[in-house]
A protein has these predicted regions:
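Glycine-rich phosphate-binding loops of nucleotide-dependent enzymes
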Residues: 1-151
């Protein structure tokens, strides 16, 4: 139930939850995200950090969003779960879903982004393109300098 909260309008019919449709949607979403759980009814709090993060992403993917804002999507999770989340982000971007990723891990930002916008004190202090990143003209020091710039 927890995994389908964000998409209730898709599984409620005449005021009642369509349980079979809900379970099928959650099952498919969990399979796409490679969530490892004994059953769909397992409490999310009992799962590993990586699987908890994947459940949260699966929940929002059920809504079929046009834009996803991911704040520290891989903080504190194992390498395997990070890979799954990165893979999901690439697949979503290929489908035309815009992803705004907020991360304090600069190598992650540089590796995953088509464009990087550095924000400091509510203002954009630097913008970098994928071409600049790939050409090596953008370094972690450039990003940090932009972040520490006086606005």
């Amino acid at each position: 139930e927890n995994a389908s909260l964000a998409s209730l309008e898709r599984i409620i019919y005449k005021g009642y939850t369509h349980t079979a449709k809900e379970k099928q949607s959650v099952k498919e979403s969990f399979e796409k995200m490679h969530v490892k759980t004994p059953t769909l009814d397992t409490a999310i709090s009992t799962l590993s950090g990586g699987n908890q993060q994947k459940v949260l992403l699966a929940r929002w993917l059920l809504c079929e969003p046009d834009i996803m804002i991911l704040d520290e999507p891989t903080r504190g999770i194992d390498v395997g779960a990070k890979f799954e989340i990165y893979k999901m982000m690439v697949e979503l971007a290929k489908k035309g879903i815009a992803i705004i990723m907020i991360s304090s891990e600069l190598p992650e930002v540089m590796g995953m982004s088509d464009r990087i916008m550095v924000v400091s004190k509510g203002r954009i202090t630097g913008t970098y393109t994928k071409d600049e990143i790939d050409a090596g003209s953008v370094t972690q020091n450039n990003l940090l300098s932009s972040a520490l710039q006086e606005v």
